[in-house]
């Protein structure tokens, strides 16, 4: 029965009641009043049902959207990342929040934590309930996996083996490059002092070591040549600092050493802040790949997996990759949108990868475990 047909029939019933009862009697008046109240409730119920059946929502573009679910509650994500990604994420997150709201009619808020990749890894293992981690190297994600927080095979869940940002190694020199450093090989000269952190305690120092080893392997050398070369370089390291920040302080503030190895993106970001640096990007280099992963145990606890996956996928879009490129990271994939930004980076003729050396598990065992290659190199100093 239609809404207006119900109203007409109710009106006819009401008129019959009026005719039957005498309005001058109290009993008749009360009966009429109660019937009127019941009729009003019935009409209101009919009206409510009619409005519900035709309910839709319209977005800003004028298109009709599905009704919003009563369970479509606000969602919070916790992002834990290594320090130098902050500028990029600060630009990316509002864009993702806006897009998710438009497509899902759901509000998303973020809690963010930034710091050294190693310390962030330990914090997550010790109880920082990250939903998404963006770290400096895959070895750190593997540690969280081994702690039971991330499911095995995390690197296959997203494109590029889970790598969402990348850079290469850069060689910073003193102003004017007085030692005339041009390639990695120059670091083995007797009169050159290199400042770097200990690769057994620092993530960036592991990349530094791989850049040196890779340079020997990619220029026609074998394992023995690489070992001899890297041994000579580390003999030129006066002190191994505990982390990259301390290495930078010793080089920049204390004036020690002739060269410092750092990420290219860190140098670009420093230049954007007005710092003047002399540096070289060797054309034989290592791809410094920064992976991202969902912390499965935490998203299952927080029941926000869908949004976490949506955020990670958004980081691979041209819009997000542009923001990474603006602060010095190289795009993980060249697209028409990122091609212009990518053109500002020096070309790398021979680029090595972690996969060239068996992945992080193999690298850790071969080079950085107790008694492995790096300890043997240090024993020769």
Q: What are these regions, as identified by a protein language model?
A:
Residues 46-147, 157-158:
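Early extracytoplasmic/lumenal segment of secretory-pathway proteins
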Residues 219-284, 291:
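Ligand-binding pocket segment of bilobal, Venus flytrap-like solute-binding proteins
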Residues 71, 145-218:
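A conserved helix-loop-strand patch within extracytoplasmic ligand-binding domains
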Residues 127-133, 191-192, 253-259:
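Alpha-to-beta junction loops
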Residues 48-52, 299-381:
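Extracellular/periplasmic juxtamembrane helices and adjacent flexible linkers that interface
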Residues 94-104, 185-249:
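Ligand-binding cleft/hinge of the Venus flytrap
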Residues 1-74:
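Short, low-complexity disordered leader/linker segments with a strong preference
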Residues 72-74, 105-107, 119, 127-129, ...:
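Extracytoplasmic
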